[in-house]
Amino acid sequence: QYCTIFDKEMIWYSIDAFRKAKTIDDFIVVVDANEMKSGRLNKDYGVTLVQGGSTRNESFKNALDYIHEHFPDCENIIENNAACPMITPELIDEFITLLKDYDYVNTAYKITDALGSYKDRIANREDFYLIQAPDAYRFPLLYKHFDKDSELCHPAHQLPLSATEYRYFDYNDNYKVTYPDDIKIVEMMMTRRKENK
């Protein structure tokens, strides 16, 4: 999340989107122990830092606990991965608005390739979809049910089956930076988005 895209750290794009969103009051950035100790992101961007844990679930729980303690009246939250820098303020606002009618919102993608299964010889791709950040939740419901020791790696999977889900299939230019070459792809996508405005 600290590599550079168009002369800005990748994490800057998420920070900028959250800062410009109209439907949220505040946001936090979860970082590892070394980044927390240095406080660099706070100095550079003026953001509130929360120290993460040894696992993704521990880090997420630390964030939830911070929100619960410092924002006791929090109704809704949205999380993003800094490795997904294409997020926009408008998307954040749309996800938060959807929480008026749903318990949580997932960024979803249809599977277009063939799908295999370790358990069954045949897997019907129509039964599955991909999930990526961002995702949004009604905070009290998520806080009540989230367990940092769970083997489930996506927060929504810990919610009760009665929780209502909105699958957001319209975030077409989301892209997660995983490998160095992905940066070139994101820069191309950002350029195209700017040209289409």
What are these regions (language model features)?
Residues 18-19, 67, 159:
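Hydrophobic C-terminal alpha-helix "anchor/cap" residues
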Residues 49-51, 125-129:
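Short pre-catalytic strand/loop immediately N-terminal to key active-site residues, enriched for Gly-Thr
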Residues 55-118, 132:
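Conserved beta-loop-beta/alpha segment of the NTase-like Rossmann-fold superfamily
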Residues 34-40:
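Short, charged/polar "capping" segments at the starts of alpha-helices
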Residues 3, 85, 121, 135, ...:
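Residues that recognize and position ribonucleotide moieties
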Residues 1-33:
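N-terminal glycine-rich phosphate-binding loop and ensuing alpha1 helix
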Residues 130-197:
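Conserved alpha/beta core of the MobA/IspD/sugar-nucleotide pyrophosphorylase nucleotidyltransferase superfamily
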